C-alpha cells in the first residue's frame, strides 16, 4: 500500500480565461460616441482624432462617425474617428 496519495495528472492542467482583447470596431465601420473601438494592453495602437483613451488603454469614440486606422510613424499606428460629412 502506498503511504502517500498518488499525484493526479491534472495538477498542471490549468489555463486562464481569455481577456476578450482586440479590435471591436473595424476600419470603415460607423460608431457612436462612447463605442469601444479597441481593447488592448498598453498602447499598441495610439489614439488619434476624436477618440479617447481609458485608464486600461481602451480606445473609444468621442463623436459619432467612421473609424479609420492610420500610420503616423514608420512603426506606430493610430485610430481616428471622422464625422460623416
Swiss-Prot record:
Gene Ontology cellular component annotations, sorted alphabetically: cytosolic large ribosomal subunit
Task: Give the record's keywords alphabetically.
Answer: Ribonucleoprotein, Ribosomal protein
Report any one BP term from Gene Ontology: translation
Pfam families referenced in this protein's UniProt entry, alphabetically? Ribosomal_L27
Q: Name one GO molecular function term.
A: structural constituent of ribosome
Kindly give the HAMAP family that the UniProt entry links to this protein. Answer: Ribosomal_bL27
Question: Family, per the entry?
Answer: Belongs to the bacterial ribosomal protein bL27 family.
Q: What is this protein called?
A: Large ribosomal subunit protein bL27
Q: Which organism is it from?
A: Campylobacter hominis (strain ATCC BAA-381 / DSM 21671 / CCUG 45161 / LMG 19568 / NCTC 13146 / CH001A)
Amino acid at each position: 500500500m502506498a503511504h502517500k496519495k498518488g499525484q493526479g495528472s491534472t495538477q498542471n492542467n490549468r489555463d486562464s480565461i481569455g481577456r476578450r482583447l482586440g479590435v471591436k470596431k473595424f476600419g470603415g465601420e460607423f460608431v457612436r460616441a462612447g463605442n469601444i473601438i479597441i481593447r488592448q494592453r498598453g498602447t499598441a495602437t495610439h489614439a488619434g482624432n476624436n477618440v479617447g483613451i481609458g485608464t486600461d488603454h481602451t480606445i473609444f469614440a468621442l463623436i459619432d462617425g467612421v473609424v479609420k486606422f492610420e500610420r503616423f510613424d514608420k512603426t506606430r499606428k493610430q485610430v481616428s474617428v471622422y464625422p460623416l460629412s
